[in-house]
Structure formats: C-alpha cells, structure tokens
Amino acid sequence: MLNKRAQILLKTLVERYISEGQPVGSRSLSKFSGLDLSAATIRNVMADLEDMGLVASPHASAGRIPTHQGYRFFVDTLLVVKPLDVIEIHQLQDQLHPDNPSRLINSASQLLAELTRFAGVVVSPKRNSAIFRYIEFMSLSEKRVLLIIVTPEGDVQNRVLFTDRNYSQSELTEAANFINHNYAGCAIDEIRTRLQSELKQLRQDMTSLMTAAIDAGDAAIRENSEAVIVAGERKLLDVQDLSSNMASLKKLFDLFERKTALLQLLEFSRKAEGVQIFIGEECGVVTMDEFSVVTAPYRVDGKMVGTVAVIGPTRMAYERVIPVVDMTARLLSSALSLH
C-alpha cells in the first residue's frame, strides 16, 4: 500500500501526463503536488513507484509516465470523478428521446463520441431467447397476414405470414388477444412448449396461425438481435497519442469491423454493476494494448439488456469519460423502459 505522500505524487504525475502528454519530471511534481519536498526526495519516491511497476522512464534523462498498472491504481484509488454539468445532462436528455428504439441506440453512440471526442459504442439488447411485449395481426390480401411484433425494448418488427386460408380481421384480433393475454413476456421457446398442450381446444387452423406467428416472431427478433453500433471512430485519428501509431489504429478499426471480439470484450460489462474500466491488456484483446475501454450496462424494466462504452487512448481524462458513460447508460435505460 502506498503512503499518502506517494499517492499524492502518483496522482499528480498521472494528471499532468493526461493533461500534457509529456513525461513528468520532479520539478513539475514539486510545483503541482502541493508538497514541500526536495527534488531528491521526489526522485526517491519516483524510483520506488518505478520498482512497483506504477511508473516508467521512457528515456534515461526524461521524467516518468504512468504504466497501465499505474493507471489502474489511479482509477481505483485516486481518481476524483467530476459530475456532468446541467447543460450536458440536458443535452443527453434531449437527444435520448427519439420515437424509435433503433434511433435511440444510434443517438446514444453518437452522443458518447461527441461528448468524449473518442469512439462511442452501444451494444443493442441481447436476446438469448426471443421475448415479445405484444403482437398484432393485420389482414392483407388473400391468404396473407401481416404480423407486427413489439419487443420489450419497444422495437417493432414486421413479418408477412402466408396462410392456408383467409382470416377475417375479427379472427386475427381474437388470435392476437389470446397470445398477448397468455404469453406476452414469455420466452419463445417456452411458448412453443405450451402451445402443444394449451391450444388443443382451438380449431386446427387457428393453432397453425399462432404457431406460424410464434416462429416468425422468433426469427424476426433474433435476426435483429445484438447489433454493435460504433460512432466517432474517426475522432481517434485526432488523438495525438494514436495518430502517430497508425498500425495500432488500423488494428482497432479492423476490430470495429469484425465486432465479434468487441462483443466479447463488452460482455464483461453485463456481469457487473455500474461503470467498468479496462486499461490496455485488461481488455483481453491484443490489438487494444494502447487503449482503454469505459463501459456500463443499461437496462429495460430493471433487466440488463445491453452495454454502452467509450474507447480511447489509455491517456484519457477518466474523470470526464466515466460520468458521460454512466449518465448515458442511465438515461438510455429510462428512455427504453418508457417504450
């Protein structure tokens, strides 16, 4: 455990390095730490921090910079998070109110990018087993029925069913009411099992319609499940630490394209409460050793369904990014729960 003096010097070093991007020497530490210490004492403390793996010397004659381990100690122990100001909160609230949940997800990723100047990522709700809030049937032309499925997140999917006979609108309404009353909020796999026994009392043609609707609804919901929306990738080109390492950026952009590894990384966020921070190799992806990821899960009706994240350099203003991610997740949860 670091003593108070070492903690203050490490905190000062990390903050100065994040702010200026240059190795921090003993003179700067003496000036900004508020401690009345000699240069020799500061150098001794820095040597101890280096032995502990918290700081490193990029050049023999230069100052020191934080290591990934140093960033981790800073984030876990020393960081003071700055709350968002009222104007920024209102900006988030105003933007996270579109009618369509898909636009809501896109708006969230764009806001994350705009407010942090890094890449904003939102993973849309994951559905291990498709669930619907309610369905509607609408008669089209001969032997064609429009199935309208509304998910718990408020997303709307449409499918056309080809039927063995024509159905009146009253029959379709009766079938939809039966399904909504008995099965709304249930997993599709559970509904299929229950249909086998519970629909025996209905006419065979009505049973066929309902079974077709459940199958089509399952396909529609799963087909549109768990997309990864990334916004602001190009903003990373403006980050000095990254623009000088195009090979690393190219690998990150490839990761954005593939998205599978990105999903695996963000999956960790679902397993914990609140904001999670992954620094460098903690991301578990070789191509992200120079990056940090700040994530938070969002919910619909209290259930975790997706993730928001910001991806940027390890030298990021964590005290700024963390509240942006946290507030975006909270407001997205509220907006989706209203649908």
From Swiss-Prot:
It holds the Pfam family HrcA. It comes from the Bacteria. One of its GO terms (biological process) is negative regulation of DNA-templated transcription. SUPFAM superfamilies: GAF domain-like, Winged helix' DNA-binding domain. Signal peptide: none annotated. One of its GO terms (molecular function) is DNA binding. Keywords: Repressor, Stress response, Transcription, Transcription regulation. Negative regulator of class I heat shock genes (grpE-dnaK-dnaJ and groELS operons). Prevents heat-shock induction of these operons. Belongs to the HrcA family. HAMAP family: HrcA. This is Heat-inducible transcription repressor HrcA. It comes from Nitrosospira multiformis (strain ATCC 25196 / NCIMB 11849 / C 71). The lineage of its organism: Bacteria, Pseudomonadati, Pseudomonadota, Betaproteobacteria, Nitrosomonadales.
